[in-house]
Amino acid sequence: MRHKNSGKKLNRTPSHRKALFRNMANELIKHGKICTTETKAKELRRIVEPLITLALRNDLHSRRLAFQSMGDHQLVKHLFNNVAPAFVNVPGGYTRITRLALRRKGDCAPMAMIEFTCQKIDEKSI
């Protein structure tokens, strides 16, 4: 029974899943939007939104927790200085998932684009 087991396994080991979502979260924070499968986008939202909430607190402990999750000092600085200030007055819902019309060519997987809802983020500052 799968009672209280949240999250998709995506046919990967736990370490592979952790690395996949760490890389996807880093790319989303770096570029502002990425295209991926619909299932991965929905799971990525569960990782990125708490990171932005953490960045809104803007203290040393929050930075250390964000680095623990992201693993890159430059991206942590970008998250805290550029991404989070755009969401100061937003109570939640920092990302938007848009389903794309075309499916992936190889396996016909449903694709989606995940992006930040606020577009005032400067991508060039990394």
From Swiss-Prot:
Keyword match RNA-binding: no
Source species, domain of life: Bacteria
Alphabetical UniProt keywords: Ribonucleoprotein, Ribosomal protein
Cellular component, GO annotation: cytosolic large ribosomal subunit
Transmembrane segments: none
Disulfide linkage: none
GO molecular function: structural constituent of ribosome
BP GO annotations: translation
InterPro entries (UniProt xref): Ribosomal_bL17 (IPR000456), Ribosomal_bL17_sf (IPR036373)
Family to which the UniProt record says this protein belongs: Belongs to the bacterial ribosomal protein bL17 family.
NCBIfam families listed in its UniProt record: L17
Subunit record text: Part of the 50S ribosomal subunit. Contacts protein L32.
Entry protein name: Large ribosomal subunit protein bL17
Organism whose genome encodes this protein: Lawsonia intracellularis (strain PHE/MN1-00)
The organism's taxonomic lineage, starting at the top: Bacteria, Pseudomonadati, Thermodesulfobacteriota, Desulfovibrionia, Desulfovibrionales
Annotated gene: rplQ
